[in-house]
Regions:
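Hydrophobic small-molecule pocket/channel-lining residues, especially in calycin-type beta-barrels
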Residues: 1-131
Length: 131
């Protein structure tokens, strides 16, 4: 599938503002902007296995399209939600457990890049990865 492979962070757009909107403290925002994140994605039908490796943590997440699951961000924020596939774009809708606010996430392949877009409380950020 198109998402399959290992992707390394290339650049961020508005990521610190997004983290600030999410309530991440200044020190963690500075560190998070330089996390050297590498994502490995494997798709098996409707099931995805995503491995995230960064300077701060290494985790593996398994999810099935359309099925709710629990997830914790690197700063400890707990979320519940699901990914769906809309055309060639993965669309995630997650609700924060602490305040009930919604985080939207998108993953799509554009050329040779994986673009992750986050939208929270009107703040949009992009993280761009290359294989």
């Amino acid at each position: 599938m198109a998402f399959d492979g290992t992707w390394k962070i290339e650049r961020n757009e508005n990521y610190e503002k997004f983290m600030e909107a999410m309530g991440v403290g200044m020190m963690k925002r500075k560190l998070g902007a330089h996390d050297n994140l590498k994502i490995t994605i494997r798709q098996e039908g409707n099931k995805f296995i995503v491995k995230e490796a960064s300077n701060f943590r290494n985790i593996e997440i398994e999810f099935t399209l359309g099925v709710n699951f629990e997830y914790s961000l690197a700063d400890g924020t707990e979320l519940s939600g699901a990914w769906t596939l809309e055309g060639n774009k993965l669309v995630g809708t997650f609700t924060r457990k602490d305040n009930g606010k919604v985080l939207k996430a998108y993953r799509e392949i554009v050329g040779d890049e994986l673009i992750q877009t986050y939208i929270y409380e009107g703040v949009e950020s992009k993280r761009v990865f290359k294989r």
